[in-house]
């Protein structure tokens, strides 16, 4: 088994294949695992294994996603591939599979198609930081001028959506040829992975980012003070460090962490991913509640107005049966709590149908800790009717 070779000391990067239906995303995913498996860096996964993507639930939305993992000489990758277009839209908009970079697959036989455009736009909206292009099926195109034309079209489309179209790596190859071990095409898969290694930056580790913990619960411990519990979202907290407490009218609430509790033991520090209780000096239990966040001083501000990119569940997915209109007021579930907000639709849009994805403006009734990229679910009477993420802070 190749699994034993996985070297966890390599930096980890999340990638995914995007692009138009039938342009070869899944075949390329299979080809990458095959070429790397032949070097002992992955487990080979065949097309049908990847294509039969298991259903996953993310914030109440069912998404079909395939996850494969592989390594190159320098990195370890988790790679997502989705069978259907709707799955991509849901995946990218809800951030179910966070991508540090994307491999855009475009068939040389077709050139960019409607979903190519839509996936590039989505990648722009949800902030996929980097991309590499694989021009697939070039073995089926005899005319080199046609290949140049398709490359030009791809570059123009990328530039139109504010990606570096002029400089982005475009590798011309054949996923099927690579999968069938034809040396000429295997080389193009290797070239692609070199580009992915070089062009997609390693994301900053969660522990290197400024400390933030959403509050889940608050207790009062006699003689010790107030303890707020939650899962540390990012960063590191050490006993003795100062923090800000933000959201729901917590104005300039500051404190010092006098202890970090984990599994009933008092520790000196907690880091991203830990479920902890933070002992807070000089804070009344009444002044802090679920949904607030505790963070590194000055790192996050409370906001009440933002733009978001959302996916609205279809009726079949358990969403609304009817469209919603301007000034619709659902709850936005952010981190650990619901906040009511009013939705403003883009000019010229009268209503939003179940199954749509759209950019909206939201005014929340309370200011909470918000930042670009924060994900949320949209709920109505406790059931999820949509999901999305913050794309811009307005106020």
From Swiss-Prot:
Region (G5): 174-176
Sequence segments annotated as region (G3): 81-84
Region (G1): 19-26
EC number per UniProt: 3.6.5.3
Region of interest (G2), ranges: 60-64
Quaternary structure and interacting proteins, as annotated: Monomer.
The protein, known as: Elongation factor Tu
Gene: tuf
């Amino acid at each position: 088994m190749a699994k034993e070779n996985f070297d966890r000391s390599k930096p980890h990067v999340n990638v995914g294949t995007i692009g138009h239906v039938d342009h070869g995303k899944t075949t390329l995913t299979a080809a990458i695992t095959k070429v790397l498996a032949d070097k002992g860096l992955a487990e080979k996964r065949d097309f049908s294994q990847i294509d039969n993507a298991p259903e996953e639930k993310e914030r109440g939305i069912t998404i079909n996603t395939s996850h494969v993992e592989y390594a190159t000489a320098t990195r370890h990758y988790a790679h997502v591939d989705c069978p259907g277009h709707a799955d991509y839209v849901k995946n990218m908009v809800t951030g179910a599979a966070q991508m540090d970079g994307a491999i855009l697959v475009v068939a040389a036989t077709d050139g960019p198609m409607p979903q190519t455009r839509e996936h590039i736009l989505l990648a722009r909206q949800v902030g996929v930081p980097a991309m590499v292009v694989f021009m697939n099926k070039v073995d089926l195109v005899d005319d080199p001028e046609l290949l140049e034309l398709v490359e030009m079209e791809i570059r123009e489309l990328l530039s139109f959506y504010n990606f570096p179209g002029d400089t982005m790596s475009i590798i011309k190859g054949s996923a099927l040829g690579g999968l069938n071990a034809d040396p000429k095409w295997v080389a193009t898969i290797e070239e692609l992975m070199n580009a992915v290694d070089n062009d997609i930056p390693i994301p900053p580790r969660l522990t290197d980012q400024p400390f933030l913990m959403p509050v889940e619960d608050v207790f009062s411990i006699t003689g010790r003070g107030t303890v707020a519990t939650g899962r540390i979202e990012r960063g590191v907290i050490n006993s003795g460090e100062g923090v800000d407490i933000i959201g729901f009218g917590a104005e300039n609430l500051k404190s010092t962490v006098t202890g970090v509790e984990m599994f009933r033991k008092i520790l000196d520090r907690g880091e991203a991913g830990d479920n902890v209780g933070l002992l807070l000096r000089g804070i009344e239990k009444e002044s802090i509640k679920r949904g607030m966040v505790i963070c590194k001083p000055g790192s996050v501000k409370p906001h009440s107005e933002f733009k978001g990119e959302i996916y609205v569940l279809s009726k079949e997915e358990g969403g609304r049966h009817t469209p919603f209109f301007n000034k619709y007021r659902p709850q936005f579930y952010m981190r650990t709590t619901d906040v009511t907000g009013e939705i403003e639709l883009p000019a010229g849009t009268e209503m939003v149908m179940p199954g749509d994805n759209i950019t909206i403006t939201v005014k929340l009734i309370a200011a909470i800790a918000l930042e670009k990229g924060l994900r949320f679910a949209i709920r109505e009477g406790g059931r999820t009717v949509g999901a999305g993420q913050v794309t811009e802070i307005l106020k």
